[in-house]
Amino acid sequence: MRLGAQFLPEKFDEYIASVRMAEQAGYEFAWLVDSQVLWEDVYVYLTHGLDSTERITFGTAVTNPLTRHATVTASFFATLAGLHPGRVALGIGRGDSSVRTMGLPPARTGQLEQYVRSLRPLLSAQTAKLDGADVRLRWLQQDPGVPIMMSGTGPRNLRLAGALADRVMLYVGVTPEAVQWAMRHVGEGARSAGRDPAELKVSILCAMHVSDDHEGAAAACRWAPAACANHIADLARNNPRHDMPEVMVRLLKAREAYDYYTGHLDSSAAHTAYLTTELIDDFAIAGPI
């Protein structure tokens, strides 16, 4: 098992100290949130994080097709990978707080697919078709080797990730029931594209807090199910005939209003108060090990 840690681009000095600590502790990935309204610029933090460490891989978890044009994303990640070979990954999703805070909906599956299909050639020193135009990064002479990770909660995006991504990030909780359900859809997508599902790299996004105090540890992880519930609600709204597992349905039924501005990814936010320890345990690793 390989471990990664997620970081918010804020409190710069604390961030640098934290990524160094993560590297020393053996973490292999440092994933940064891309949400330009709520936090500082992720590109700046990725760059300084890489400059301040020696081994750990840095990437977005996740960027999106709506606030970052494909050429901008490709140029940045190709540049960064040229400076730090083998230590850069590009995480992409449909967009959550980065777009909802501007009153916009997340990207549709078709938009996400087109974005990734455009990024592949751009990141490989090849020509991409963008809005009918042939576009390439003129300065890029060879493939810098930037793996693409795609996140997913619902079947469509999970299947898309299985078809296109180098790594899939599951955002469905940590129960065997939910993970197996998600992997079934990832596998379907992989096979539809002629890929072997067994060769895909898979990550699970969850909160983790190790402590002898189970209740206290769970309370520290409230942010994870509270945020995931927004994606589950979208899935239920866009696909009423969904087949999501019962653990996700339970969270959906308990879900209350969510305020991105006052406490996104914050376990102390008022909108996490409804979460019981049982619900949290479905979406986090909390307590003694």
Outline where the language-model segments fall.
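An alpha-helical appendage that flanks or caps ligand/catalytic pockets
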Residues: 105-139, 179, 184-289
